């Protein structure tokens, strides 16, 4: 089966028909991860792409998570939500921010797409939040689709006389965290660089001389990756960018360093629990996580669900994006948990960088 053949067969049966929720596909596509991506990118499908996307979800044991609407399980539930909901926002374009990254996860493949929503109204293009989609592919099916983006801007109104949109509360989805482990061991060259750096200043202007795999292993290491000075050293001096929904976008190593060293010590006792494997393909890495507050009594409170993407070029980190929803951070219960965990972040900290 090729992607073209798959689309040909679909159109032979369904061309010109409106997408329907009364449909269940029980035969796998017989396509690999790239093939399924090629299918949903086929321009011949037009608005029927939503039906085809739903067709590709495994009938049972699949999940679609959306930062506004939460989690849906199994092809039937995913289809019943996906098709009517996306039809309501057909004026929104999802503009790619980078090429799709494919990762070998040892089980069928994972893809990462970064995008920005753009509303097209009366000929005007209105930029909306950026987001990321992580999909996992298994045996001819999509089994995992998680769309993470900031819903905070959708939950407020720029006009004080206009009520905010009627949206459901932010999702309380429960995520199964993977056991904490050092799944990115450091090479001899990475350890040597870290040992040498400890004797140097905090300013990095020369390439660290490390492979992209070394850069990846350092920033995802449970100890080295928590040292914000080390992370800053690995960012390109001028051609680097860091995206954060709360603080905006920072460019260049100096600005990123100031922000990391200023803000990160104020977040309190937090743990980033992985909800998927840390993946690396030579150019980019991805990690899905839940930020968890560690309270003095030993209990924990999950705060936000996020996805982090890193990109590497010429021996530097050139791009870092942490995608998460800020809506939970406006919840009084979550704010109380963050304060109990020692967070001292204030609105002034955010305003200083945005």
What do these predicted ranges mean?
Residues 184-187, 211, 251, 255:
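Intrinsically disordered, low-complexity coil/linker segments enriched for acidic/polar
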Residues 9, 13-60, 192-238:
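Short acidic-aromatic low-complexity motifs
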Residues 76, 203, 214, 227, ...:
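Intrinsic disorder/low-complexity segments enriched in polar/small residues
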Residues 35, 48-111, 228-285:
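A solvent-exposed, acidic/Ser-Thr-rich amphipathic alpha-helical stretch
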Residues 2-25, 86-207, 264-354:
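A beta-strand edge to alpha-helix "cap/lid" segment located at domain peripheries
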Residues 40-44, 53, 57, 63, ...:
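Broad hydrophobic/π-residue packing in well-ordered secondary structure
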Residues 73, 225, 251, 325-326, ...:
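General structural signal for secondary-structure boundaries
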């Amino acid at each position: 089966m090729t992607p073209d053949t798959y689309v040909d067969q679909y159109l032979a049966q369904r061309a010109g028909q409106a997408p329907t929720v009364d449909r269940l596909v029980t035969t796998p596509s017989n396509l690999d991860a790239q093939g399924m991506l090629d299918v949903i990118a086929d321009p011949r499908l037009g608005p029927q792409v939503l039906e085809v996307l739903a067709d590709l979800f495994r009938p049972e044991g699949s999940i679609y998570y959306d930062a506004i609407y939460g989690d849906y399980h199994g092809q039937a539930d995913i289809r019943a939500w996906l098709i009517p909901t996306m039809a309501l926002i057909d004026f929104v374009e999802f503009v790619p921010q980078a090429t799709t990254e494919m990762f070998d996860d040892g089980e069928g493949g994972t893809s990462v797409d970064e995008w920005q929503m753009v509303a097209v109204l009366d000929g005007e293009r209105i930029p909306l939040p950026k987001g990321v989609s992580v999909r996992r592919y298994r045996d001819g099916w999509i089994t995992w689709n998680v769309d993470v983006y900031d819903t905070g801007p959708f939950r407020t109104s720029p006009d004080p006389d206009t009520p905010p949109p009627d949206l459901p509360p932010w999702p309380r989805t429960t995520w199964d965290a993977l056991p904490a482990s050092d799944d990115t061991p450091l090479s001899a060259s990475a350890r040597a660089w870290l040992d040498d750096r400890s004797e140097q200043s905090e300013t990095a202007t020369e390439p660290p001389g490390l492979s992209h795999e070394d850069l990846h292993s350092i920033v995802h290491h449970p100890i080295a990756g928590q040292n914000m000075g080390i992370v800053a050293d690995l960012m390109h001096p001028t051609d680097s960018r860091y995206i954060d929904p709360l603080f905006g976008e920072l460019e260049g190593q100096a600005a990123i360093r100031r922000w990391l060293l200023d803000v990160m010590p104020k977040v309190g006792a937090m743990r980033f629990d992985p909800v998927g494997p840390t993946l690396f393909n030579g150019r980019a890495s991805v990690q899905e996580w839940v930020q968890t507050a560690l309270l003095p009594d030993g209990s924990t409170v999950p705060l936000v669900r996020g996805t982090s993407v890193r990109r590497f070029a010429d021996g530097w980190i050139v791009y870092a994006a942490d995608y998460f929803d800020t809506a939970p951070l406006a919840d009084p219960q979550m704010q109380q948990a963050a304060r109990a965990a020692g967070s001292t972040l204030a609105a002034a900290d955010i305003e200083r960088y945005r």
